[in-house]
Swiss-Prot record:
Record's protein name: Probable enoyl-CoA hydratase EchA6
Family to which this protein belongs: Belongs to the enoyl-CoA hydratase/isomerase family.
SUPFAM superfamilies: ClpP/crotonase
The protein's enzyme class: lyase
Domain of life: Bacteria
Record-annotated disulphide pairs: none
One of the GO BP terms on file: fatty acid beta-oxidation
Length: 243
């Protein structure tokens, strides 16, 4: 479900589920986690993460095992692996990054975004709640006001606007991302490791307040989540009740 190639000091990892728009199931998450962890065993000094086909990652595979009991823990381990990697991870965002795909993009240290790509958290369309890290990191990358629009109304963030906010560092292709990663790989690795560690320790990872956890659990355990799934299968708008 992933492809791994290396050119000199740049390791490229490609999500390879184009038929599902690279949606994350447990197997893909596990393979990606292991690839990130093993990346430091060789001569690589930078990682490029991209998706095969027209999407970077369409989020969690809602038709698969995304609601399995251990799926959230697997996803957390993936994010921990990316955060702990001593190498910079450059996201080559080749298409839409939605939901868990946007979380994956935000965990990258830098992002080169295709002109027709966009970012979206459609959680309010599915009755779901986001963890605190995702909300805090989104706010730091796009600004508080735009984060509110994305979270409360499921607004899409285009590549052009993402470049202005800082979500996108550059507009470009996979080749552009690989070229940038090659430049970075020639820089001093210890200096990069220190900068990455300090930047990532920005307070976005926090213990949820009791009120946050209560509302989070209430959303995930609600009938609205079931209604969203049923409506999706029946191809109709959901009728949310707030319960």
């Amino acid at each position: 479900m992933i492809g791994i190639t290396q050119a000199e000091a740049v390791l490229t990892i490609e999500l390879q589920r184009p038929e599902r728009r690279n949606a994350l199931n447990s197997q893909l998450v596990e393979e990606l986690t292991q690839a990130i962890r093993k990346a430091g065993d060789g001569s690589a000094r930078a990682i490029v993460l991209t998706g095969q086909g027209t999407a970077f990652c369409a989020g969690a595979d809602l038709s698969g095992d995304a609601f399995a009991a251990d799926y959230p823990d697997r996803l957390i381990e993936l994010h921990k692996a990316m955060d702990a990697s001593p190498m910079p991870v450059v996201g080559a965002i080749n298409g839409p990054a939605i939901g868990a795909g946007l979380q994956l993009a935000m965990q990258c240290d830098l992002r080169v975004v295709a002109p027709d790509a966009f970012f979206q958290f459609p959680t309010s369309k599915y009755g779901l709640a986001l963890d605190n890290w995702s909300i805090r990191r989104l706010s730091s990358l796009v600004g508080h006001g735009r984060a509110r629009a994305m979270l409360l109304s499921a607004e899409k963030l285009t590549a052009e606007i993402a470049l202005h906010t800082g979500m996108a560092n550059r507009i470009g292709t996979l080749a552009d991302a690989q070229a940038w990663a090659a430049e970075i790989a020639r820089l001093a690795p210890l200096a990069i490791q220190h900068a990455k560690r300090v930047l990532n320790d920005d307070g976005a990872i926090e213990e949820a307040w009791p009120a946050h956890k209560e509302l989070f659990d209430k959303a995930w355990g609600s009938q609205d989540v079931i209604e969203a799934q049923v409506a999706r299968m029946e191809k109709r708008p959901p009728k949310f009740q707030g319960a």
